[in-house]
Design a protein with these regions (language model features):
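Conserved catalytic core of the tyrosine transesterase superfamily
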Residues: 1-205
Length: 205
């Protein structure tokens, strides 16, 4: 029957290539992480937006740190433009709550179109290392309200994986997810299908 067939397909071993386990956040973990920064401070508001945007858009850390003010287009169809691997440009639609955070944040920045979206106090773009450190710091703080984050290694790429899994859970096909993430090869996107044990269980029910 269909269940037996699906079980057989899932039992087929993957190609003998080096694989990396995909680490992603649950909805509760993502919510706790985004809520961790102290938004009474300028740095806290910056960090909250960075975490939120990383999870909503799935941008690579290099793409996040290279965003400029004019990378954001606010309007009836708000979107973000970024330059990814191979200098390939892609456009990502923005959710309403993301637009609200961006609008508030942009009002705090100098009106310089080519200025960094995520600057330091000195006005220079955040580095990849700085993003990694702030994510680790806020993850530790968020563990106080979400115990499953305790001891969890959350990196910039974890935010990207979280976005991909959210899209997958929403029923988005892997071809569309590949375009969203800027994958040049759809096989790269297939790792999320294999990683999603919850989806496998639902399929077998």
């Amino acid at each position: 029957d269909a269940v037996a067939t699906i079980s057989q397909v899932l039992a087929i071993p993957a190609k003998r290539t080096k694989t990396t386990l995909v680490s992603f956040l649950t909805a509760a973990e993502a919510e706790a992480l985004i809520a961790a920064p102290d938004t009474r401070t300028w740095l806290g508001r910056r960090d909250r937006l960075l975490l939120h945007l990383g999870i909503q858009t799935g941008l690579r850390v290099s793409e996040l740190t290279s965003l400029h003010i004019d990378s954001i287009q606010i309007g009836p169809h708000s979107q973000l433009e970024c330059i990814g691997k191979g200098r390939k440009q892609r456009v990502i639609p923005l959710q309403k709550n993301t637009v609200q955070l961006l609008t508030a944040w942009l009002s705090e920045l100098p009106s310089t179109p080519d200025g960094p979206l995520f600057p330091t106090h000195a006005g220079t773009p955040l580095t990849r290392a700085a993003v990694g450190k702030l994510i680790a710091r806020h993850t530790a703080a968020a563990a106080g309200r979400c115990s499953s984050l305790a001891g969890k290694n959350v990196t910039p790429h974890t935010l990207r994986h979280t976005c991909a899994m959210s899209l997958l859970h929403a029923g988005i096909d892997t071809a569309s997810i590949a375009l969203w993430l800027g994958h040049s090869n759809i096989q790269t996107t297939q790792i999320y299908l294999h990683a999603d044990l919850e989806l496998k269980r639902r399929t077998l029910e």
